[in-house]
């Protein structure tokens, strides 16, 4: 009988095996609406759980500091080539362990401590690594932040230009963690050129949409592009750096290794290669289009039920529910949907009077449940479930009904039906 990795884990460490199995069951039984999460394919899982985890491979393909990298080199080169093809880049580094690591490598390449960076305020939808005072990017560099218009809750490029002209940053950052609208990278390029700044696009959230042409591609306009490889790209958790400037690419490579990292995680890079290959297939185009259709369907249904959305809708995979109109905090809303097996996250909204630990918003996304096969009909039902729960927060009857409807949806769209980690019954 052939033994699987799961068999070995179960026999070696039933406690960990049992907890992994419980997490698998949680993922199966919940509606996953966290905008930054997705479900990788079984092939990606297999690559990450392979013997590649054993191999040290400091350096780049063909230029390693360790022996025995002949097969590692081929795998990493495939990942590089596929990433370049997917995004239309001339250079790709697939080694960053995360999106944050990718951004740090860019900072090391383009900036010196004390230089000024300009990115979106975290409370308006930016990211920690774009100059938040609690992050190293906000400690090593001077920072100025732009936000969205108070009237439209969308980017105001005239305001951004005025701030850039006043502050003269060395690096201008676009790309966000909670912005539901299209980004005009060409306008950002014009602003960067006017003030003599480098332009970085962090497309961690929208990479899958960019790869399929459903969101404008920043590469023709930006000096450097960074992204994560999960979220809408549906790969393993990791980072990626892209550029069309080959000479700049060499400097970025040195900033990844030895600048900010040691040995790359080759089992994760193999998972990235598999995911990039999947994203190059025609089926991924249909998936990405469905992600947007499902997000718009969910947004429309929430609005139909009387809930307010930041910027009045979405162009991509995510939306922000502004709960101030129903006198509720994001923390309370997160708790309410969690109780009926919906996973989301509280989130600040623009000009939020609440603290980041409380917030006035709830962020929702469509990628994960689209991966499970759900379409507009299911996302209409999801919108109704969320509205029923939030608009009837004190009703146990409504809560039980919502939980039942969540279970019915999950049962119709099974997750990883082939996966099971057998856990022995301990005496």
Swiss-Prot record:
It catalyses: (6R)-5,10-methylene-5,6,7,8-tetrahydrofolate + glycine + H2O = (6S)-5,6,7,8-tetrahydrofolate + L-serine. One of its GO terms (biological process) is tetrahydrofolate interconversion. GO terms for cellular component: cytosol. It is found in: Cytoplasm. The modification N6-(pyridoxal phosphate)lysine is found at residue 231. It comes from Nostoc sp. (strain PCC 7120 / SAG 25.82 / UTEX 2576). This is Serine hydroxymethyltransferase. Its EC number is 2.1.2.1. Pathway: One-carbon metabolism; tetrahydrofolate interconversion; Amino-acid biosynthesis; glycine biosynthesis; glycine from L-serine: step 1/1. One of its GO terms (molecular function) is pyridoxal phosphate binding. PROSITE patterns: SHMT. The keyword Protein biosynthesis does not apply. The record marks 230 as: Plays an important role in substrate specificity. The keyword Cytoplasm applies. Catalyzes the reversible interconversion of serine and glycine with tetrahydrofolate (THF) serving as the one-carbon carrier. This reaction serves as the major source of one-carbon groups required for the biosynthesis of purines, thymidylate, methionine, and other important biomolecules. Also exhibits THF-independent aldolase activity toward beta-hydroxyamino acids, producing glycine and aldehydes, via a retro-aldol mechanism. Belongs to the SHMT family. It comes from the Bacteria. Its cofactor is pyridoxal 5'-phosphate. It is an enzyme of class 2 (transferase). The lineage of its organism: Bacteria, Bacillati, Cyanobacteriota, Cyanophyceae, Nostocales. Homodimer. Pfam families: SHMT.
